[in-house]
Regions:
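Substrate-binding pocket helix/loop in short-chain dehydrogenase/reductase
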Residues: 116-117, 121-129
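Residue(s) in the substrate-gating loop at a strand-loop-helix junction
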Residues: 159
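C-terminal helical subdomain
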Residues: 195, 199-200, 220-260
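Active-site helix of classical SDR
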Residues: 140, 175-176
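Conserved glycine-rich Rossmann-like NAD(P)H-binding loop of the short-chain dehydrogenase/reductase
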Residues: 49-64
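Conserved NAD(P)H cofactor-binding loop of Rossmann-fold oxidoreductase domains
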Residues: 108-113
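Conserved glycine-rich cofactor-binding loop
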Residues: 26, 33-34
Length: 260
């Protein structure tokens, strides 16, 4: 029997494999101290990935790392404020020096502040822009060489506000629309390198941030009627594991029961 010849390059053969195995992959998850970011980080670790947990809350991260390791999961913590360029560059240097690779980058950190247009302070707009737009943009830019080398994947955890703006959400929604634009543009630039880019637009999810929003709106907070962070994490992991012949570009996910 003669061996069938193939004209695929090694990179093409890698990209066309039946599915993406997350075991031993290096994943960086920002906003990993709570909510959706925490759920995604734990889900990736549960699939065998080496997860770098990134947040401003180091104490919370270290407790999460301790818990993960008690269950034989691989995780490490890094305190990073995405509004500070020096923090981002320090994280990148650490990843380059210790891991030397990044297979998955998940952007889940962010700021959300709601107010009517007439009263919303520009300082709030600036803070949300730096955390939700500029920080993720710079971190992705700095990690692109490692992502290209790994034919990696980038996930932007956006918001339903990234698709539709509502009253009192003008500043936040503007940053989420900007994040979608960054993801769409990046996808066009890096697909040829084997990098996949996913935007996720969750509706209201049972997280501390959502509870705060309900309090601001003077509405009863019923987390059992909302999506759970693990729901979003399951969708993200499924998309990351899809065969390399395809790409999930956007996921819009909402609670089944609308309590708002």
């Amino acid at each position: 029997m003669t061996k069938e010849m193939t004209t695929e390059s090694p990179a093409e053969q890698k990209r066309s494999s039946s599915s993406q195995n997350l075991c031993d992959r290096v994943a960086v998850v920002t906003g990993a101290s709570s909510g959706i970011g925490r759920a995604i980080a734990l889900a990736l670790a549960g699939k065998g990935a080496q997860v770098r947990l990134v947040s401003r809350k180091l104490d919370t991260l270290e407790y999460l790392v301790k818990t993960a390791r008690e269950h034989s999961l691989r995780a490490s913590a890094c305190r990073v404020d995405l509004t500070r360029d020096e923090d981002i560059h320090a994280l990148v240097a650490d990843l380059e020096g210790n891991d030397g690779r990044v297979d998955v980058l998940v952007h889940c950190a962010g700021e959300i502040r709601h107010a009517e247009h007439a009263r919303a302070p520009l300082t709030d707009f600036d803070a949300q822009y730096r955390a939700n737009v500029r920080g993720p943009y710079l971190l992705t830019q700095c990690l692109l060489p490692l992502l290209r080398a790994a034919s990696g994947q980038v996930v932007f955890i956006n918001s339903s506000s990234g698709l539709r703006a509502r009253a009192r959400s003008g500043q936040f929604a503007a940053t989420q629309h900007a994040m979608k634009a960054i993801a769409d543009s990046l996808r066009e630039e890096v697909n040829a390198d084997g990098i996949r880019v996913l935007s996720v637009f969750p509706g209201r999810t049972a997280t501390p941030r959502t509870e705060q929003l309900f309090q601001e709106e003077r509405k009863a907070y019923r987390p059992e009627l909302l999506m759970q962070p693990e729901d979003v994490a399951a969708m993200v992991v499924h998309a990351l594991k899809m065969p390399r012949t395809c790409e999930v570009t956007e996921i819009s996910i909402r609670p089944l029961f609308k309590s708002y």
